């Protein structure tokens, strides 16, 4: 912890279940670099911590921006927090930052909520003098986030939706493959999004030996120090911890099948937590109604 008060200064709903909050956290803002994340505890009485990548930071104002999707109990609690309220804790910045240097051509692929952590990385490569192509994927146009911010600096911007309601009707791997096949192909690809998307982005880039592929993994975390082992992943023949060794890894070395299996194992637990939370909310609403 670092003494910041973690007050929510702004709250914006980007789509049906995606929110952006600006939090007062001067110490985190001063130290944050692209690719790093924080562990957030919403309620002191409910101690679960969740990893959220820092989407933006303003060291002068002492603020950080977090973009998250309402999928489980903690993110639901966070989505309900009003402006002016405080989070219990924001631990960070954690993880190894992205190694930003001037590259010939970088293609950054963001899928769904993964667009948020991809944004500062793509922007940093642009500011370093790299040519940057941005590919964004979403199920439909209502779920596209941060498009104006990305278009502002991208040398090439490609939007894909599953239903064709905006941009191309395609998966992100389709334009990614086309770009890799160009004569002026990228020397680096960065993919951030659902694990299955990153797996197939890696498979798309893998045949092109002269193109690096980096992925940013988002796994279960508890302490952020590697002691709990909840975030362990197999990278090549070794066990690594996302919180201290990542979150970025060479996509070609990630054991995607074992990681996906571990993530699936936690879903029934998260569903039960959400069901309990909904029951408590309904009971509280019923009690308030009876007191009227």
PLM regions and their residue ranges:
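Structural signal for conserved beta-strand scaffold positions within catalytic alpha/beta enzyme cores
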Residues: 10, 56, 159-161, 215, ...
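Local cysteine-cluster metal-coordination motifs and their immediate loop/turn environment
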Residues: 117, 195-196, 218-248, 277-281
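Ferredoxin-reductase
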Residues: 2-85
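FNR/FR-type flavoprotein reductase catalytic core
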Residues: 73-222
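Short Fe-S-cluster ligation motifs
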Residues: 244-245, 249-292
